Design a protein with these regions (language model features):
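Amphipathic alpha-helical packing segments from all-alpha helical-bundle domains
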Residues: 106-109, 124-128, 139-165
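Short alpha-helical scaffolding segments that buttress acidic/His motifs in well-ordered protein cores
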Residues: 111, 115, 129-136, 180, ...
Length: 235
């Protein structure tokens, strides 16, 4: 920013002013992100305008969202990236604590628990599960989730799961990965919605819910594979 001002012949701000401005900018951006994820979760991504987000962020200038994010897709990407960074950090910690020969349940735990731990730490209420479930099923925004899902920790988990399931044909393994993703996203979104509405949920804690999801996914991954007669499948 200062380089641009000098090139244009402008004077540098007084000492300390730039740092203060940067700090305010970070705070404003964070306020926008927090307001956006709440409104997206409660009302739907496509139903919420930048003006509504700016107002919910407590900004008098309701066009402020456009200053920080060029489009709604950019805002959605920032939210997905922000949450995934926290999940990946927690996942890396779990991977680092694995034993010498982790099994299927160990890798499934590394997949599920970090996601739910972040939701537990954030509330109640929390909004990210409902937001992520919406984006993951939106035709125009789903690619953002797919692009931002790739991380070293996630690849290690998927490799670990595959290593525990050598008997599964590759197409079946990939299909069950997709099923696992939908189960995690949708079950967490439903649980988050119920908690936000003040309903009782079972199990009561996110950790217990994560353990239940691991049970389900391990059962799915180890389920029998029914052979498909390709000749009977019509295009």
């Amino acid at each position: 920013m200062d380089e641009f001002k000098l090139a244009a012949g402008g004077a540098l701000p007084p000492r300390g002013e730039s740092a203060t401005s940067d700090s305010r900018g970070v705070a404003t951006r964070n306020a926008i992100l927090e307001a956006a994820v709440r409104l997206f979760a409660e009302q739907g991504v496509l139903a919420v305008s930048n003006r509504q987000i700016g107002a919910a962020a407590g900004k008098g200038n309701t066009s402020v969202v456009g200053y920080y994010f060029d489009s709604k897709a950019d805002l959605v990407r920032a939210l997905v990236r922000r949450f995934n960074a926290r999940v990946n950090e927690a996942r890396e910690d779990r991977i680092a604590r694995l034993g010498a020969k982790p099994g299927l349940r160990d890798w499934a735990t590394c997949l599920v628990h970090p996601y739910l731990e972040l939701l537990e730490a954030g509330g109640p209420p929390t909004w990210y599960a409902r937001f992520m479930a919406q984006v993951a099923t939106d035709p125009g925004l789903r690619r953002i989730v797919v692009e931002e899902a790739t991380s070293e920790s996630m690849l290690r988990v998927l490799d670990g799961l595959a290593g525990c399931l050598p008997e599964l044909p590759e197409p079946v393994l990939r299909e069950r990965y997709r099923i696992a993703s939908h189960v995690i996203l949708q079950m967490c979104a439903e649980r988050e919605r119920a908690l936000a509405d003040g309903q009782q949920v079972h199990p009561a804690g996110w950790d217990e819910a994560a353990t239940g999801l691991v049970d389900v996914l391990v059962g799915m991954w180890t389920a029998a594979v029914t052979p498909v007669d390709e000749s009977s499948v019509t295009s």
